[in-house]
Amino acid sequence: MIKFFRKIRQKLLTEDKFSKYLIYAIGEIILVVIGILIALQINNWNESRKDFAKSKNYLSEIRKDLVGDTIAFNRSIKSISASIDVGEWALNRIHDNTSPIDSLWMSFDGTYWDTSVNDRTFQRVQNVGDSKFTGFESITDEINNYYGITKRRVEYKTSWDEKEVSENQSYMRDLEKYIEIDEYRMNMDGAGTLEKTFSIRQDSLEHVRMMIEFANSTRGRNHFKNNYVRHSRLLNIFKEVKETAAELIIKINKELEQME
């Protein structure tokens, strides 16, 4: 092909047909430019296909992370809801020696929840410098918001929850001055890891009576009320996060199905 055009150019020069040669030269330049543009366009298409394939894979992995988030937050929601129920029971129904000892100990719960948003895949995307999901721009902002705004809200609330628990644990020191820890409490704190437990030396009825007395004291009731507020606030945000993650999963599924 190059030889063919070269022969034409030489013939035009030999025949002293400069005007025709000039037109030919301009046409040749235009063809070269068009060829370069086509090559660049093909290269862009290839890069776009590669970026699309990567984005599709990233979305599939993010969907797995979101499913894990819904499971983790749902587990915490159930646990917090149970603690709220026990707290309500403690505020409304602790009044006599028939109160079960295990429910009494549960009502003094000092657990905090550190459930977090799993951003493993999103961080991998950020680390390679991808600021958007090629071919899936319609949900890019929602994904960025989930791993930005939503994640920070969860971190703030769980950090606050841990701080509240730490600052309000002094009541346990007061309680343990008079009430011996029983087998149930040891097993609860040990989370099933203890090989041995030890019986209490306090009279069982006296043991329960003292716990009820503390639970009905101003300090005890304030503890239950603080726990109720803490649990309720955390429950609300965990429900919001679970709902947001579930909605994002649906949107990702829809986008991936449309691209099949």
Features from the language model and the residues they span:
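Long, hydrophobic alpha-helical segments that serve as membrane-spanning/inserting helices
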Residues: 1-19, 23, 37, 44-260
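Hydrophobic membrane-insertion alpha-helices, especially the h-region
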Residues: 26-41
